[in-house]
């Protein structure tokens, strides 16, 4: 299954607030669908599936990518759910978004893909690059890069900059101070249900 490229607001209405996916908030109270969905008690499977979908759509991942990250997280000592979130949060595209250098994750992905971002003075155009403590992030010095990011910074942010990141808005220079903590993850979801979903496949 490839990365979703359809209407973002429809997904947000179905799954709830996904800060990485869209800045828009639906004014409709009914869930997505022609007449909304009938309210009924969800099954355990549907609950696990919904949490998995939240993760996939918020971080803009394909099913194959998310499955790969689950396998990586399971090989690391510790809570698989927390490690999974840390892997996703430390992706370069997500770090750019959490710093406020872009209004959404899709916009952050474009900044990275188009070569606007430097890591430790080297251009990195791979969105999945795993940032680590000590990394220095800069915006390219050329006017097109600087002006685009400055325009993005003028947008009101949906979530604040987490404690493990710091940003100088004048120089457009940022630093990663630590691995993200669970309480700094902006997405409201239950990562344990995602681990259960893949464990039962």
Curated annotation (Swiss-Prot):
One Pfam family it belongs to: S4
Gene Ontology BP annotations: ribosomal small subunit biogenesis; translation
Cellular compartment(s): Plastid, Chloroplast
CDD domains according to UniProt: S4 (cd00165)
Main localization (coarse): plastid
Keywords: Chloroplast, Plastid, Ribonucleoprotein, Ribosomal protein, RNA-binding, rRNA-binding
GO terms assigned for molecular function: rRNA binding; structural constituent of ribosome
Domain S4 RNA-binding residues, every copy: 90-153
Transmembrane segments: none
NCBIfam families registered for this protein in UniProt: PRK05327.1 (NF003717), rpsD_bact (TIGR01017)
Main function: One of the primary rRNA binding proteins, it binds directly to 16S rRNA where it nucleates assembly of the body of the 30S subunit.
Subunit structure: Part of the 30S ribosomal subunit. Contacts protein S5. The interaction surface between S4 and S5 is involved in control of translational fidelity.
Family: Belongs to the universal ribosomal protein uS4 family.
Name this polypeptide is given: Small ribosomal subunit protein uS4c
Gene name tied to this protein: rps4
């Amino acid at each position: 299954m490839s990365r979703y490229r359809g209407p973002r607001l429809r997904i947000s209405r179905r799954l709830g607030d996904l800060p990485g996916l869209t800045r828009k908030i639906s004014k409709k109270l009914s869930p997505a669908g022609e007449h909304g969905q009938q309210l009924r008690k969800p099954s355990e499977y549907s609950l696990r599936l919904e949490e998995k979908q939240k993760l996939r759509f918020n971080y803009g991942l394909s099913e194959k990518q998310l499955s790969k990250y689950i396998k990586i997280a399971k090989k690391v000592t510790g809570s698989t759910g927390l490690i999974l979130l840390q892997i996703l949060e430390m992706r370069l595209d997500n770090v750019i978004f959490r710093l406020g250098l872009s209004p959404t994750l899709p916009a952050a992905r474009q900044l990275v893909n188009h070569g606007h971002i430097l890591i430790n003075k080297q251009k990195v155009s791979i969105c999945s690059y795993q940032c680590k403590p000590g990394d220095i992030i800069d915006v390219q010095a050329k006017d097109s890069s600087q002006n685009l990011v400055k325009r993005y910074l003028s947008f009101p942010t949906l979530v604040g900059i987490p404690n493990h990141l710091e940003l100088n808005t004048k120089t457009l220079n940022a630093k990663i101070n630590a691995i993200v903590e669970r309480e700094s993850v902006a997405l409201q979801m239950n990562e344990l249900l995602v681990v259960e979903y893949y464990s039962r496949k």
